[in-house]
Amino acid sequence: RFVEEADLVILTLGDKYGTCSLASMGEGIDSTYINLPKCQEAFIERAAQFRKPLVGIHFSGRPISSDVADKNLSAILEAWAPAEAGAKAIVDILYGVVSPSGKLPVSVAVNAGQIPIYYNHPWGSASHQGESIGFANYLETSHKPRYCFGYGLSYGEFVYSDMKISKPEVKPDELITV
């Protein structure tokens, strides 16, 4: 009933923090499953049936990777583990007091088989063969991440132009200015 009457639906998603067997994130708790819990994906699918804009706020120590979330959520706010001031920061973003301008500090895999996933990591066992013999991707998915390092949206629009670097080549310990 509440979803039917709402203009927008905000869903809180993520893992259960802790140190015991009931936790799905926390110190020393690892998982090979990188999607949302199945019950949360079912909840998203049920809420999507009402055809209202859905915003997901994701609380976890790892980024969200979910086909269901990708397909049905209008926006995802990656809150990580926000601590004491997190609630105020999230409310300020939702009400437009501040603009969500953060960028992802990691690339987010589509599925666990892509991990590790970063910009210059060789892909699979045939990566050295390239596209010349048909091994350009995994069998089930491409090599592209769900969300790339640095991905993020904002309420505003930004344009970068006339970008220049101070040196065309740098050594590993040198700095450049952009």
Label the model's feature ranges.
Residues 1-71:
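Hydrophobic helix-and-loop "lid/oligomerization" segment in the mid-to-C-terminal part
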